[in-house]
Curated annotation (Swiss-Prot):
Xref: NCBIfam families: PRK05412.1
Listed name of the protein: Nucleotide-binding protein NE2248
The entry's keywords: Nucleotide-binding
InterPro entries: DUF520, UPF0234-like_C, UPF0234_N, YajQ-like_sf
Similarity comment: Belongs to the YajQ family.
GO cellular component, one term: cytosol
Function recorded in the entry: Nucleotide-binding protein.
Source organism: Nitrosomonas europaea (strain ATCC 19718 / CIP 103999 / KCTC 2705 / NBRC 14298)
SUPFAM superfamilies: YajQ-like (SSF89963)
Positions in coiled-coil regions: none
Entry's Gene Ontology molecular function annotations: nucleotide binding
Amino acid sequence: MPSFDIVSEVDKQEIRNAVDQLNKEVSTRFDFKGSDARAEQTDYELYLYADDEFKLGQVMDILMTKFTKREIDVRCLEKGQTEKISGNKVKQKVTVKTGVESDLAKKIIKLVKDSKLKVQASIQGEVVRVTGAKRDILQEAIQLVKGSITELPLQFRNFRD
């Protein structure tokens, strides 16, 4: 039976490249001269540091620009609370969401079942597997999910006949 997987993945190396480009741009920009603005990465978590809220907003804008240039969808970014650290300096945690969370997976399964397409969808960890009798029906399911789910960038992988 033909099947495919619905996943949400972000390449860790592309994140690293975007963060490196951000740090390089911040170090050379005139409006950040003498500033301690920077970004650090640990796996899928980013920490943005700046001297004040305004500069933190600018660092976030630069981050989104760099992600877009590296073809990373910015919908996968989840901003955390802004924290004050020593003096006037501020820090913000930004999480890169990967994997299809259970709430979104249930929403996808409900969407597919309510569409009356002859396919079955099941949750397998952070992946939603969709199986059907014909390839054409699976392609209709892909179009349905692409058109309806917009809160997280989804990829359709492992298409098998």
